[in-house]
Amino acid sequence: MKLDYINEENKFNEDEFEELTEDEIYLNKGADAYQAGDYETAIRLYQKSADMENITALSNLGYCYYYGRSFPVDKTKAKECWEKAAIFGDIPSVYKLGDMYRYGDLPQNLDYSHALYKRAFLLALDNMDNYYVAPDAFLRMLKYYPEEISDFGYSPIDIAAHCVIGIKDRIARGDNYSGKVLSDAKAVLIKLLDE
């Protein structure tokens, strides 16, 4: 999937921005700054985009708060961002809330975490071509509830292979944060193939 606003060097084409809305321009420039490690600029641009009701920018702000990008870690603010974005079906926000309930960032609730992972998985099935979000949602179900994947008409092995391919694709496009996720996806695929 070639994004029309990214050129061969994985930099945003200024000429292509006229096809995007103002909030999308701020979002994409923020993502470019984030990948370059310029978190202050990324946060400023994400906030502008979120103020224009861009749900992805709101989700990305959640990551900045959760991981302490340019300010102290604030998991309460991360949760607030992700809850707002999850209402609109933002896949990363849904599974990150699931992580917070699974790993104890919020009062641990494995049943609710499971429900959130399942919701993210179902949303991702409708967005399988989006390698920036679908593999992460799939991976959580593969790690914790692989037996349920076939209930939706998919083979866990096929979903795991899709994850590996998708994560490799986004790394090739300049994603600097997916190395560990790729290792996890490969490990899950190998485990499934060995069963």
Give the role of each language-model region.
Residues 22-41, 45-48:
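Alpha-helical segment of the N-proximal tetratricopeptide repeat
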Residues 21-22, 52-54, 67-69, 87-90, ...:
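Short helix-capping/linker turns of helical repeat alpha-solenoids
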Residues 26-33, 60-67, 96-103, 138-145, ...:
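Hydrophobic face of amphipathic alpha-helices that form TPR/SEL1-like repeat modules
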Residues 111-126, 139, 152-172:
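TPR/TPR-like (Sel1-like) alpha-helical repeat modules
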Residues 10-25:
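TPR-adjacent "capping" and linker segments in tetratricopeptide-repeat scaffold/adaptor proteins
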